[in-house]
Design a protein with these regions (language model features):
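FAD-site-proximal beta/loop scaffold in flavoenzymes
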Residues: 152-168, 251-329
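Glycine-rich flavin
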Residues: 2-5, 21-28, 33-166, 199-203, ...
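Short hydrophobic core segments
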Residues: 8-10, 115, 130-140, 172-173, ...
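Beta1/beta-strand and adjacent pyrophosphate-binding region of the FAD-binding site
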Residues: 2-13, 166-176
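Flexible, glycine-rich terminal cap/loop adjacent to redox cofactors
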Residues: 8-15, 21-36, 41, 48, ...
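A Rossmann-like FAD-binding core segment of flavoenzymes
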Residues: 109-112, 116-124, 189-289, 330, ...
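A conserved FAD-binding loop/helix module that cradles the flavin
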Residues: 213, 301-361, 432-435, 440-451
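Glycine-rich dinucleotide-binding loop and its adjacent helix/turn
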Residues: 47, 139-192, 224-225, 273-275, ...
Length: 451
């Protein structure tokens, strides 16, 4: 006989945990199904371990690039990759403990194992059947590996976090967040790093000002950027090294190859066909604005929904809003996917909210868009030989010059933009920005002093 719940969340990542906890807080009988470590991609092989590695890279840059001009004679005896990994994993372990504690306090039933649908109201885990009035699919995605000869000799972005030793020479293939971040970390920590992108630049969906500045810094400081580089074949040499051959005839010999070319939805292993839930050709689940699929009682949040934003806070927010609607009598609760702030932990970091210049002109008309920009050298680097640019932009629309896009790249931009996101969600105009007294000397003051 099947065990019945009010709510079953398939996937113990950020979205599933957030939704399960919120539903349980309102008295729902909830099951959370996860086969691996709680926290999903973000906590285990994504945002969290990546940010720890990035902090390590920042410390390396401080010592190697900037300390001397601040008067410090730093004698770096070496870098212990294994120690950083040990510290990183200990931190992740504490997050796992926190999840266990909070889920336990909320009386969420955590079921370990892989879930498969039996029908639209029933799932099977380890041979046991569970039913629910409401079922959330939040299984996330997996890294994609290209279909070329020798691709198996490389590792994916998840495998980067399994590296027990620091590689001496690395090729990172990809043009998105993950590729740029991994390449930046490895380069800063001392690995000879090559970043290969298919087109003319990485991060092509970002505002051109951001892209141009990032490429400028890469050209000056590294990692080595290879544009118009399409992988053709990977050959494993007799000495164990790998040679990446490109369609343009060029090649690069490295010790490690990391594929970071994107992700695909992990919907192929849950027997979704038994439910009738609609997906697109790539396996992404189709949902409406309330996270509902075409099958009553089945919902979806996170990286596997069609047209979604693949960011942890988005999945968390969407999962919580869904539980508010289902279990807290808030029929209109839903995720607002407009003006979502995002950061790339590159070198230097990038922050962006809203529309690029081109997107704003397409939406509002070129004559109704005004752009303000600022460029300077961050004070932190300005007193050193390794000066690094900082660029900022406001994209404004309409007679009132509502701020519809905010973009920045430079020292500490990652910590600047959260508050501006609040202002933009409230409909802030350029005049509102101008009315704020600047904090001096900071980089963030540029956002409220542009002319």
């Amino acid at each position: 006989m099947a065990t019945h719940f009010d709510y079953i969340c398939i996937g113990g990542g950020s979205g599933g945990i957030a939704s399960a906890n919120r539903a349980a807080m309102y008295g729902a009988k909830v099951a959370l199904i996860e086969a691996q470590d709680l926290g999903g991609t973000c906590v285990n092989v994504g945002c969290v371990p990546k940010k720890v590695m990035w902090h390590g890279a920042q410390i390396a840059e401080a010592m190697n690039l900037y300390a001397e001009d601040y008067g410090f004679d730093v004698d770096v005896k070496g870098f212990d990759w294994s120690k950083l990994v040990e510290s990183r994993q200990a931190y992740i372990g504490r997050i796992h403990q926190s999840y266990d504690r909070v889920l336990g306090n909320n009386k969420v039933n955590v079921i370990k194992g892989f879930a498969k649908f039996v029908d639209e109201k029933t799932v099977e885990v380890n041979g046991e059947h569970y039913t629910a009035d409401h079922i959330l699919i939040a299984v996330g995605g997996r890294p994609t590996i290209p279909n070329i000869p020798g691709a198996e000799y490389g590792i994916d972005s998840n495998g980067f976090f399994d590296l027990a030793e620091q590689p001496k020479r690395v090729a990172v293939v990809g043009a998105g967040y993950i590729a740029v971040e991994i390449a930046g970390v490895l380069h800063a920590l001392g690995t000879e790093t090559h970043l290969f992108v298919r087109k003319e630049s990485p991060l092509r969906s970002f505002d051109p000002m951001i892209i141009d500045t990032l490429v400028e810094v890469m050209d000056a400081e590294g990692p080595t950027l290879h544009t118009h580089s399409v992988p053709k074949e990977v050959v494993k040499e007799a000495d164990g090294s790998l040679t990446l051959h490109l369609e343009n005839g060029e090649s690069q010999n490295v010790d490690q190859l990391i594929w970071a070319i994107g992700r695909h939805p992990a919907t192929d292993a849950i027997n979704l066909a038994s439910t009738g839930v609609a997906t697109n050709k790539k396996g992404y689940i189709k949902v409406d604005e309330y996270q509902e699929t075409n099958v009553k009682g089945i919902y979806c949040v996170g990286d596997i929904m069609e047209g979604g934003i693949e960011l942890t806070p988005v999945a968390v927010k969407a999962g919580r809003q869904l539980s508010e609607r289902l279990f807290n009598n808030k029929p209109n609760a839903k995720m607002d996917y407009d003006l979502v702030p995002t950061v790339v932990f590159s070198h230097p970091p990038i922050g962006t909210i809203g529309l690029t210049t081109q997107e704003a002109e397409e939406k509002y008309g070129k004559d109704n868009v005004k752009v303000y920009t600022s460029g300077f050298t961050a004070m932190y680097t300005a007193v050193t030989k390794h000066r690094q640019p900082c660029k900022m932009k406001l994209v404004c629309a309409g007679e009132e010059e509502t701020v519809v896009g905010l973009h920045g790249i430079g020292f500490t931009v990652d910590e600047m933009i959260q508050g501006f996101g609040v202002a933009m969600k409230m409909g802030a105009t350029k005049a509102d920005f101008d009315s704020v007294v600047a904090i001096h000397p900071t980089g963030s003051e540029e956002f409220v002093t542009m002319r």
